[in-house]
């Protein structure tokens, strides 16, 4: 990184606890045009990256560097040249390597794929036909695999190869840290959804994610949806960073320009999300630490004083454990596990099961007069015993309502179409277990047994 960054006000980078890796994730600038709007917004985010002390070991760019999407190869090459020589000219790429993911603005046909190979010269260790498009990098105990989520040889946007991915993960099974990078998400973000155009197509998605889970991948890092988002599915994080300069938000009023500074060490992953002014807007430590037994408290059946009021601050979460037996088959009613409320207002939080499939559901109310947002998870099997753990983790935004079964199960985020989550919830002063705020007959739990405990961290 150029020494010029020393004149900026420094931003202290997170550092590994002992040996590890310190790096930056960002993407989606749609620039490469001199004097364009996105050139200015990208410069603002780059100014933040340049203030990081110490500088990152490497940078992962999740795609859409340039506006692209042109049939003219010379125009496309000129955009790449402007982006590399002028917009990223401050960076010493020999000292701080940058690895790029393919994307819909940069690799949209065979011509643009060839251009990507030529101008970026990424490693040529990918599957046949995808050399320089899909590839892997090994740095000590870290493996980073880049997958092409729009290969022309497989069908274009939203299509991704999986056999090679599985082979590379098997070959490098000894890597302590495994990251996979691709442009398109697998799981919808902020309610913006659509197979192929916004996520990897359904004929690939399940196999793709199962490979990540089975190989012990820590995170799939993506972009495309103009937001920062984190969620977890079967223990694997999906981290979306797509705010490096494109002057649109998904949605406006919630999302913001940003970059992500992250570290990996023997204890896991930590990151901080910095906006274009250098302010830390979001952060996370993963995996979730196990809570000691003394943190857990039984929540009595019926109505009681809440164990938590107000908002969850950074790093804080609420853990619930629900044990019992599900209602019999044929039960269709909404059934309450726990409700949090204040007298005279609709409960801002309801946790329970709904419908004939007894689907785990969390409902968070927002502003008065506005519809609440719904999160959906697994089904409870009729009449079966269950040991359900549920977490409200403000640092994960809309991905921060998580569940698992048993102490050793893998965490998964409940699915939602919201751009916000428990971080905006003002926890009220009353809780009720086994029924909702209206009393004993209000959406009561219909199984023969239910016990609840909670821990605040």
Regions found by a protein language model. Give the residues of each.
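A short C-terminal boundary segment appended to hydrolase-like catalytic domains
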Residues: 263-315
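Extracellular glycan-associated modules
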Residues: 292-457
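Short acidic, glycine-rich surface-loop motifs adjacent to enzyme active sites
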Residues: 172-191
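Extended active-site neighborhood of metal-dependent phosphoesterases/phosphodiesterases
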Residues: 2-11, 70-177, 195-219, 227-265, ...
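N-terminal active-site segment of His-dependent metallophosphoesterases
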Residues: 1-77, 189
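Active-site glycine-centered loops adjacent to acidic/histidine catalytic or metal-binding residues
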Residues: 28, 63-64, 103-104, 183, ...
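Residue-level marker for buried hydrophobic side chains located in beta-strands
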Residues: 23-25, 59-61, 100, 180, ...
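A general structural motif
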Residues: 20, 56, 95, 174-177, ...
């Amino acid at each position: 990184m150029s020494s010029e960054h020393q004149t900026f006000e420094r931003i202290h980078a997170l550092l590994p606890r002992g040996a590890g890796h310190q790096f930056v994730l960002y993407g989606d600038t749609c620039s490469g045009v001199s004097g364009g709007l996105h050139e200015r917004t990208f410069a603002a985010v780059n100014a933040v990256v340049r203030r990081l002390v110490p500088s990152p070991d490497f940078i992962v760019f999740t795609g859409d560097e340039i506006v692209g999407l042109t049939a003219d190869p010379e125009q496309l090459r000129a955009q790449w040249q402007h982006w590399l020589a002028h917009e990223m000219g401050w960076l010493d790429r020999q000292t701080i390597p940058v690895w790029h993911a393919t994307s819909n603005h940069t690799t949209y046909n065979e011509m643009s794929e060839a251009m990507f190979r030529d101008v970026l010269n990424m490693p040529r260790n990918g599957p046949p036909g995808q050399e320089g498009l899909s590839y892997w990098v090994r740095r000590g105990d870290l493996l980073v695999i880049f997958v092409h989520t729009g290969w022309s040889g497989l069908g274009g946007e939203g299509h991704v190869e999986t056999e090679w991915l599985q082979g590379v993960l098997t070959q490098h099974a000894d890597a302590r840290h495994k990251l996979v990078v691709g442009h398109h998400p697998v799981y919808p973000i902020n309610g913006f959804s659509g197979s192929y155009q916004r996520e990897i197509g359904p004929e690939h998605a399940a196999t793709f994610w199962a490979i990540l889970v089975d190989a012990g991948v820590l995170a799939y890092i993506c972009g495309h949806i103009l937001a920062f988002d984190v969620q977890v599915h079967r223990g694997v994080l999906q981290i979306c960073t797509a705010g490096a300069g494109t002057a649109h938000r998904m949605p406006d009023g919630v999302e913001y320009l940003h970059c992500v500074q992250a570290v990996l060490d023997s204890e896991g992953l930590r990151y901080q999300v910095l906006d274009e002014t250098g302010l830390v807007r979001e952060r996370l430590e993963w995996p979730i630490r196990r809570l000691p037994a003394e943190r857990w408290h039984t929540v009595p059946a019926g109505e009681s004083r809440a164990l938590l009021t107000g908002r969850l601050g950074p790093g804080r979460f609420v853990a619930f454990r629900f044990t019992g037996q599900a209602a019999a088959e044929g039960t269709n009613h909404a059934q309450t596990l726990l409700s949090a409320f204040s007298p005279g207002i609709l409960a801002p939080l309801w946790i329970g099961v709904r419908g004939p499939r007894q689907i785990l559901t969390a409902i968070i109310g927002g502003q008065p007069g506005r519809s609440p947002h719904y999160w959906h998870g697994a089904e409870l099997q009729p009449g079966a015993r269950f040991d359900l753990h549920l977490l409200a983790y403000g640092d994960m935004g809309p991905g921060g309502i998580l569940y698992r079964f048993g102490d050793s199960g893998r965490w998964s985020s409940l699915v939602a179409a919201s751009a916000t989550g428990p971080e905006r919830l003002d926890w009220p002063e009353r809780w009720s277990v086994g029924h909702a705020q209206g009393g004993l007959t209000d959406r009561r739990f219909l199984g023969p047994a239910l016990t609840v405990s909670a821990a605040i961290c």
